[in-house]
Amino acid sequence: MYDKLPLELWVKITNYSQEFGLLLTNKNFFELLYLMKFETNIIEYVVENNLLDILRHIIFLKNINHPIIMENIIDIRCLEESLNASCKNGKLEIVKLLVDLGANIFHNENCAMMLASEYGHIEIVEYLVSKGSDVRADNDYAVIYASKNGHLEIVKYLVSQGCDVRSCDSYAVRLASEYGHLEIVKFLVKKGANYRALNHHAVIEASKNKHYEIVEFLMNYSTGITK
């Protein structure tokens, strides 16, 4: 039914409704993007709606140098914003497809990898690091905020990849103490984090927030008693 409508009518309907979905009912309609005037970028639309098959089709068109891709779809800023959002939201397959499409994983000091670390998506972190992301970008932001948010597996992985647990006056262990992540505190201290940094900030914040197991661990560690 839909493919029997004249192309001119499709153009008018789609421009009026601003609905990308109308172009996704048939691969042949995709080329109508030449004639469309959308306010929203199609990559953004596809990512927000988790349309993996459409992304794969766009990659296919890119690989055969289809002119519609170069002229109408690829917007570097939008690619990077979509990559960051997908890393934050844990959408590994979309992250991979966006990288295949040309998204820059190093943009804004490796922001994509830092967001994946901060929000606890270990598989995305590992994937981005395998692609060359710098785990120490922005003064070890990734391990610091993974520590703050209690992502022990990510903290261990990042340290294994070279993150400095003493960066920014051992900020990682101070945040882990403040937010009550005992196992991360133990791990970081045993890896060399300075739990006495900034006049014992870690134990003070742990005490202030009633994380008494952390207080006990840090006090015992300072006297040579470990459990």
From Swiss-Prot:
* Ranges for the ANK repeats: 38-66, 78-107, 108-137, 139-167, 168-197, 199-227
Extract the InterPro entries matched here: Ankyrin_rpt, Ankyrin_rpt-contain_sf
| SMART domains per record | ANK
User: Domain of life, per the record?
Assistant: Viruses
Give yes or no: UniProt keyword Metal-binding.
no
**What are the protein's UniProt keywords?**
ANK repeat, Repeat
Q: Specify whether Repeat is a keyword of the entry.
A: yes
Q: Under which name does UniProt file this protein?
A: Putative ankyrin repeat protein L45
